[in-house]
Amino acid sequence: MLHPRARTMLLLSLPAVAIGIASSLILIMVMKIASVLQNLLWQRLPGTLGIAQDSPLWIIGVLTLTGIAVGLVIRFSQGHAGPDPACEPLIGAPVPPSALPGLIVALILGLAGGVSLGPEHPIITVNIALAVAIGARLLPRVNRMEWTILASAGTIGALFGTPVAAALIFSQTLNGSNEVPLWDRLFAPLMAAAAGALTTGLFFHPHFSLPIAHYGQMEMTDILSGAIVAAIAIAAGMVAVWCLPRLHAMMHQMKNPVFVLGIGGLILGILGVIGGPVSLFKGLDEMQQMVANQAFSTSGYFLLAVIKLAALVVAAASGFRGGRIFPAVFVGVALGLMLHEHVPAVPAAITVSCAILGIVLVVTRDGWLSLFMAAVVVPNTTLLPLLCIVMLPAWLLLAGKPMMMVNRQKQQPPHDNV
């Protein structure tokens, strides 16, 4: 016979697996539709019209029209496409299901149109809302927080193709006690994350690792080098943290989201012309292209890092629906490659992984997630002790510093009043 603790853990196992599978399928559906629309906008349509897809006019035009389209969705859809991600943490409170169609459409348009944001925040928001709404009907005795945790764990597992990220994130939020050990609390979320990851793996495998030269023996000087690289990435990220709420307040003085996002799309188009096509979109495929190309100089990598960081801030401040983690990883890769080009004596594995750690730490303020992203982009077990040590001064630098988020009290009134 199973112990009562084991029976308690098994109670949510089936719902957890179902939520993990559903979270992955929703992610896959959204990404597939966005991919088809992206191919239409950036491959077939310019080819039909006889225009180069990297033409400045085309880049500016598509991003401006994308901004206007997203603005129209936010202005006129029920629920205004959910909350502004610039004002929300990665895992937030459930939103009304009526806001989800507009949120999904706004996300797909942004992903396909080349906006420098990832899918993570809106997808987690959608899955939490559905899990809470459906779960409350089927199992009303289970509280909303449990459904929120299961949906976010399943989505994180699906996004990264592994339950490890969910385990790391929730190990610091689901505190154990003398009565309920931590792993009892983690059991159902890990089931959801594993189901989400395995379902994603049936359709495609998220590819984060970069072909960077293997790092061998760790030296004491490498720790100092890694700490300096992380500090540089943190400094760059804190510039974005300072800019985001100010730009957000300035742009939203116009109140009408069609104008705000249209102007935001225009600015993103201009940044895209300067940075080139590799600086567009969420950044995961583009960072693979950047590393494989090997045609950039120190100044070229620096320009890409600055453009992508600026595009991230503009997209978030404008109110585009998307997450900030994936483009931040691109910024970290560009910064790391730039620093390696500038000081070749420091291995690229150190500069890239420590830059990712620093910039993701600024964006998420989550040490485990930052370590995870650095480790999966530069997969080398020799780096793990170094990254753990470098995390310590990086965390000290950010202690008490503002988050990359707009103060909720500064949010504009609903667009119903416009």
Curated annotation (Swiss-Prot):
Gene3D superfamilies in alphabetical order: Clc chloride channel
Bilayer-crossing regions: 10-30, 54-74, 99-119, 120-140, 149-169, 186-206, 223-243, 258-278, 300-320, 322-342, 343-363, 371-391
GO cellular component terms, semicolon-separated: plasma membrane
UniProt topology in membrane: Multi-pass membrane protein
Principal subcellular localization: membrane
Intracellular or extracellular location(s): Cell membrane
Pfam family, one: Voltage_CLC
This protein's record includes keyword Transport: yes
Family to which this protein belongs: Belongs to the chloride channel (TC 2.A.49) family.
Protein name stated in the entry: Putative ion-transport protein YfeO
Gene that specifies this protein: yfeO
